[in-house]
Amino acid sequence: MTKVESEIARMVDKETKAWNDRDAETLISLFHPDMVWPWPKTPQSHDPMDWEMPLGKFNRKRWKTGWQDLFDNFRLVRNIRKIRKIAVSNEKDGAFAVVDIDTLWVDGKGNKNQWKGRVCKVYSKVKGAWKITMHTGVLEY
């Protein structure tokens, strides 16, 4: 693994730890101010014509409130993540990671919120630090 690939793997690990710790502050610290997060309507919606933008462009207060609400109202049952691929630009200032996830949240009434499938996390190096600029919602493969 190259130096940059290792840096990206550490970013994935840091994000995973933030989910595991239910740490909204650390989670949003990983996001670039221009980040967007499109979501497929279903895990089978591979055609981007079926995708949505439920969060809009990154807004620190709004996104932190949303993630904190999840953390406050759901218990994390499992959060399994496996990096499948890391690709780095020739300039070493952009990269993406393909990650298979199996994350299960359950609320106090037993309602499940499951994220299971594959995601793509896109990174840009900004002022010497990696930030997530785009992240796809979960797709089944």
What residue ranges belong to the model's regions?
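Short, low-complexity N-terminal intrinsically disordered segments enriched in polar/charged residues
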Residues: 1-34, 110
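Short, solvent-exposed loop/turn segments at secondary-structure junctions
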Residues: 45, 104-106, 141
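Short, cysteine-centered beta-strand-loop-beta hairpins and adjacent loop/turn segments enriched
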Residues: 73, 104-113
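A short hydrophobic beta-strand element
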Residues: 77-81, 92-103, 117
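Short beta-strand edge/turn micro-motifs at domain boundaries
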Residues: 114-141
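A short, structured loop/turn motif at beta-sheet edges
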Residues: 86-95, 123-129
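A solvent-exposed, acidic/Ser-Thr-rich amphipathic alpha-helical stretch
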Residues: 5-6, 24-91
